[in-house]
């Protein structure tokens, strides 16, 4: 089921009407009037989309960046790469499922792919911790980036996170140190690196994987810095 934002209500109504006209049970009975109506509604939808999305304010752009239906890292990995081999664990503490990482082929070239993954439904979002990486996630990516650097393999990273996970356990396991080490690792790599912000690029949680040679950004994606002092104090 498609999800709509509050400012997309007119588009939603038009698409519901269009779906009714395109109902397969009605196809045999479609008249020239119906087909003309379908074309007209589709044109109205296109016009509404253009009007709405060319005049978004800052909060609306943030909502679009966080949209439930926005393609996630998993989607791009499955559709852009071949022979993806996922790798897990940081060899210190455990696995962090909020980040996908592994080696793959891109245009017949071996690459390391890393993607912050929010999940596609409630269960997977909980499993992926809503894309908020823990220290073991950053240490996993550091391990793999160093491995790619050793074998001269380029690195492609997909950024989509509201920020690093601010929980007590993450802080106890060295969240700040893990982020700093990840930034340091990215800056020291000798292989080409490209980071693509596909949704949210929140704070140090994003910068830890976005310190690349090239940083690209999707339309209506967001990248921001925030002060987390009060958030940290509230945990202790």
Describe each model-derived feature in a short phrase:
Residues 225-232, 236:
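Conserved small/polar residues in nucleotide/adenosyl-binding loops
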